[in-house]
């Protein structure tokens, strides 16, 4: 039985990682920033996996998303360390929102809408903040020439906030709507 549970977990990681990649690909056609980055829905499947399986599921799904982006060539990489920070680290840490796994599970069954909204928003905020930090560090170190005479760290933070703040808001709203209408998305079958 343990092998079956692990297999289901890995299949879910693969499916949600692929969905995250496709959502990122589709939303990037709406508009991409000049030095990379865009408003994206890719965090939604990563956080759903975190809500289903905890931090381990979220981190692994985020890592797979970064790996798929890199393998498929949908990246802006100027240096290996920048690529590692902007893709592997940034998307892996989105899964840290899975730290709210138990709270989200408890808020959804039975449904306590206020608590669910609070914990989903907190999870999305944590994942977004950590992703924002990874992108900001990479931007400050590897895209400094675009800052001109502005302080590099402030320029990088403002640049990355321009798409990360809307991404956080949109993903939070979508997650709340999805989970309040279909709690089976995160409840595991017994």
Q: Where does each model-flagged region fall?
A:
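Alpha-helical transmembrane segments and their cytosolic interface
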Residues: 1-17, 122, 152-190
